Amino acid sequence: MTSPRIENPAQHLPVVGEIAAAVNRVNEEGVLPKELVILVGLRVGQLVGSSYFTARQLGEAEDTPERLGAVATWRTSPYFTEAERAALALTEAVHTPNPTGERVSDELFDEAAKHFSDKELVVLTGVLGQIGYFIPLALIGSPKVGVSFAEQWQK
């Protein structure tokens, strides 16, 4: 596919742009390191099978190729800190169905709480929500890979 399926969602529903602007401010204070936000976004892109999200995160990353290449196998990779592992585990729990029980167990939350303050956990939750907001637009609207939403959907 060479062009998006939907040229500009905001022209059909202007509140889409307002919501996008609001959710994009979730980490504007820099509570979480940009590198962590990129790793989480990259993992979500991989989990939902979105070339757009995966390429976007890789394009914004200022990390080593080894770490970026190992995100899908973070559990067995030596490249990630315990805090990053906790964030990636939360990311997978939130974005992967669990037919046998709750997605975020008490044990998983407790592990994350060892590495993040309550504020950081709320911001991480917001980052996951921000990404979650854009997933349907990326999967249904099929934006061009390597081009930002804003750049291609300004019509």
Regions found by a protein language model. Give the residues of each.
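Acidic, glycine/proline-rich low-complexity segments that act as flexible tails and inter-domain linkers
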Residues: 1-38, 58-62, 66, 145-155
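A ubiquitous short alpha-helical element
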Residues: 2-11, 73-80, 90-97
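Short acidic alpha-helix initiation/capping motifs at coil-to-helix transition points
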Residues: 14-20, 49-51, 98-106
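Short alpha-helical scaffolding segments that buttress acidic/His motifs in well-ordered protein cores
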Residues: 39-44, 71-72, 87-95, 122-135
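Helix-adjacent hinge/juxtasegments
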Residues: 57-91
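Acidic/histidine-rich alpha-helical segments that form the ligand environment
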Residues: 79-127
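Preference for long, well-ordered alpha-helical segments
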Residues: 118-155
